Design a protein with these regions (language model features):
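Transmembrane helix-bundle core of multi-pass membrane transporters
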Residues: 104-179, 206-209, 271, 276-278, ...
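Helix-loop-helix "hairpin" substructures at the membrane interface of multi-pass membrane proteins
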Residues: 154-231, 255-260
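Inter-helical junctions in multi-pass inner-membrane proteins, predominant
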Residues: 21-36, 176-181, 207-250, 273-282
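Cytosolic-side transmembrane-helix boundaries in multi-pass membrane proteins
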Residues: 9-12, 131, 191-205, 275-308
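Alpha-helical transmembrane segments within multi-pass membrane transporters and channels
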Residues: 44, 77-120, 127, 260-265
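Short, small-residue-biased leader/transition segments that mark boundaries at the very start
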Residues: 1-3
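Membrane-embedded helix boundary and interhelical linker motif in transport proteins
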Residues: 28, 50-96, 100
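Membrane-interfacial amphipathic/re-entrant helices at transmembrane-helix boundaries
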Residues: 7-39, 68, 79-82, 108-113, ...
């Protein structure tokens, strides 16, 4: 216990001594990791807002996309070229998952959909563990590493590329949702599914497309994870916790808030890692989620008191 306290104090001292340089490094790393969080969280917000399904397999979709890129890499397909391939495969997988699982539980109680997606999560974990093994895997993207401040700040170009790809893909999704007829139908269904049916929108098809689009988004996020971090079959729960924390804090249908909260969570994890150790990074995400839930509950109580 005393040793861990001393380590924390040493890390704090290091952070303050090298504050300008360390803060630049932490802020950059938070932005890089936050961009990937934002993609996965937006997919969850889409499914949650349109279908009222809390997908507990969200993180496993991300890891699955990463493993698909990993497999393609070993047959000579680079991760950037693999992006559209993985997105397409994950889209098809999402459609099949909807037809086999989600469609059967979407009209039931929320607890039923939670159990269904939790079961899907466990299934995917075991399949990935069976195929790829429990070892940590990564892709050598062969991107160079840039340095700043005489080498004290490192900027892996793989992370810069992943940030640009995440931003470009997010922009495509926004344009699609606002300009395309399918995107407008998704938004109409999210606002009022019954009214959308009256207007002639096939909501069942919209639900299938929405869940598939979410899977494709997670697949792209997974490819980016494979470039800049590591893959392991049971890491999905970590990304699921992060996406739920982000969506809970940002709210549904608010993309700027999702992006902002994703960056904040990325920074929180980076500072928690440097001060308390890498094992505290995930704990920081859980604490953020708990803090948001408590804050939401306080806000609801205040609103009820005003109504009374």
């Amino acid at each position: 216990r005393r040793s861990s306290d001393l380590t924390m104090l040493d890390n704090l001292q290091l952070l303050f001594v090298y504050a300008p340089v360390m803060n630049v490094q932490m802020l950059l790393d938070g932005i890089f990791i936050g961009a990937v969080f934002a993609l996965a969280a937006y997919g969850l917000a889409l499914v949650w807002g349109v279908m009222n399904v809390k997908n507990l397999a969200q993180g496993d979709f991300v890891i699955m996309g990463g493993y698909l890129a990993f497999s393609l890499y070993h047959v000579g397909v680079g991760p950037i070229i693999a992006l559209p391939i993985v997105a397409l495969v994950m889209f098809v997988f999402g459609w099949i998952s909807y037809l086999l699982i989600i469609k059967r539980v979407i009209d039931n109680d929320m607890f039923v959909s939670l159990l269904a997606t939790f079961g899907l999560s466990l299934f995917l974990q075991q399949v990935m563990n069976l195929i790829y093994g429990p070892e940590v895997q990564t892709i050598d993207s062969k991107f160079p590493i840039a340095t700043m401040f005489d080498g004290f700040v490192t900027v892996p170009m793989a992370k810069v590329v992943s940030l640009l790809l995440a931003g470009g893909f997010a922009a495509l999704i926004v344009v699609f949702m606002k300009k395309s007829r399918t995107g407008q139908a998704i938004r109409a269904t999210a606002q009022d599914a019954r009214a959308a049916r009256v207007l002639g929108i096939n909501t069942d098809r919209i639900y299938a497309f929405t869940f598939s689009l979410n899977a494709a988004i997670c697949g792209v996020a997974g490819v980016l994870v494979s470039i800049i971090w590591v893959l392991q079959p049971f890491y999905g729960i970590v990304y699921s916790l992060r996406t739920f924390a982000i969506v809970t804090a940002a709210g549904l249908g608010n993309l700027p808030a999702v992006i902002g909260v994703s960056f904040v969570l990325g920074w929180v994890e980076q500072y928690a890692g440097i001060i308390m150790g890498a094992e505290w990074q995930i704990a920081a995400a859980v604490m953020v989620l708990l803090g948001v839930l408590v804050w939401r509950q306080i806000q609801l109580r205040r609103q009820r008191q005003v109504v009374r």
